Amino acid sequence: METARGRVLSVASECVPLLKTGGLADVVGALPGALAAEGWEMRVLMPCYRPLRWRLEQMEEVFSEEDLFGGRGRVMAGEVAGRRMLLLDAPHLYDREGGPYAGPWGDWGDNAQRFAALSWIAARIAREGLSDGWRPEVLHAHDWQAGFAPAYLAYWGSGGVRSVLTVHNIAFQGWAPAALLPSLRLPASEFHPAALEYYGGLSSLKAGLVTADHITTVSPTYACELMRPEFGMGLQGVIAARAGQVSGILNGVDTDIWSPEAEERPYTARSLKAKAENRAVLSGAFKLDVPGPLAILVSRLTYQKGIDLIPEVLPDFIAAGGGLAVLGTGDAALEGAMRELEVRFSGRVGVRIGYDEGLSHLMFAGGDAVLVPSRFEPCGLTQMYGLRYGAIPVVALTGGLADTIINANPAALTAGCATGLTFHPTEPPAFAEALRRLIHLYADHALWEKVQKNAMRHPVGWQTSAAAYAALYRELVA
């Protein structure tokens, strides 16, 4: 590994392996190791929630502030699973029963202050450095929870530190009432539409978008989509105005954890024999007997994920010989719809409501195809798992799905480069046609195996993404 050329402070609300509620944690946890290979040292700063407090005994204090939005805060440093982690210990903000963003009765009422505190400390560390002498050259903020960090650098002085904001999902914008402006240590002079003001209030995400030196999203297509009203969710004008400082960098997946070679019945692109064994085990687990392609659906069961389309397209797919195994949780109505399909198509549809990491591995190992009919998908990891395991992705043409799947049209099949099936628009007729194409492709064994092997050889690790981030950091600090 090269000697570190630069230092980056990554600021986020969650990080694997400490805490995870979604894909954000996977990305934040994977980047330090991937960037180390590119010669960059990244430390991650996140809140010390109640379930993490036991770790403080094994850490050392490297920064503090006596009045951090209502109480004392200190930054504790230590090694966690090979990562240099920084935990913001502020019990008045984070030591409480419940999740990182919400308690038993909904979102925490002081979320604006809780995550402004995270951003404030991040900006101070960037300007002043830690007591162990470490100081970053780049502050990399993730989503609304860290959106104020670039703003604090811009308004209170950056000390030469450059800032990056990554938008993982623009649907979550960190809105707060304008009355909080002074208590959040934001300048009243910047409360106008070109800066902090957002529909009469504040948005930490918008604050980051207008002040960061560079903006990234988690796929090139999503970067373009965010400048359009149907995807920008009110912020499309802000992003379009900064188009020259916006880029899309695809996420990767942990190819050590998500590896068909590491499963109980291992297989590779060179030899797919054991994939059939995994299919048999998967069929047994869901009590299925499927003559055609066995598709899987591993997803949150929500409208955004296009799950409402499944009941409309599934009958024809079942009639043509297909089957479906479902693993997920979400909207009660959609959970009910999945259960109804299981009853209606007994032996061809199996449903598990909830999430089980081990079962998800079996589903990718045994599934012939994975369905990802999302209406919008900033990046998406599910289709990458499908590629890795030779479970052919059938995806809507949006966001990161469009950037990762090579559609099995006649030209791509002739050229021998197809890796999946895409459809557009995200509506039942187009989805149903993609499933018909899946049936026909599956019937041609030689062609099907060729597409499977193409998919499994498609690079989905972090190397390419890390190289892109490293190049961006180098450009910013040059």
From Swiss-Prot:
Acetylation as UniProt keyword: no
InterPro entries, sorted: GS/SS (IPR011835), Starch_synth_cat_dom (IPR013534)
One GO CC term, this protein: cytosol
Signal peptide: none
CDD domains: GT5_Glycogen_synthase_DULL1-like (cd03791)
Binding of ADP-alpha-D-glucose, residues: K20
Gene Ontology biological process terms, A to Z: glycogen biosynthetic process
Record-level Gene Ontology MF annotations: alpha-1,4-glucan glucosyltransferase (ADP-glucose donor) activity; alpha-1,4-glucan glucosyltransferase (UDP-glucose donor) activity
Keywords linked to the UniProt accession: Glycogen biosynthesis, Glycosyltransferase, Transferase
Top-level class of the enzyme under EC nomenclature: transferase
Pathway(s) where this gene product acts: Glycan biosynthesis; glycogen biosynthesis
EC numbers on record: 2.4.1.21
Pfam families: Glyco_trans_1_4, Glyco_transf_5
Substrates-to-products reaction catalysed: [(1->4)-alpha-D-glucosyl](n) + ADP-alpha-D-glucose = [(1->4)-alpha-D-glucosyl](n+1) + ADP + H(+)
Family per record: Belongs to the glycosyltransferase 1 family. Bacterial/plant glycogen synthase subfamily.
NCBIfam families: glgA, PRK00654.1-2
HAMAP family: Glycogen_synth (MF_00484)
Function according to Swiss-Prot or TrEMBL: Synthesizes alpha-1,4-glucan chains using ADP-glucose.
Designated name of the protein: Glycogen synthase
Source species: Cereibacter sphaeroides (strain ATCC 17025 / ATH 2.4.3) (Rhodobacter sphaeroides)
Taxonomic classification: Bacteria, Pseudomonadati, Pseudomonadota, Alphaproteobacteria, Rhodobacterales
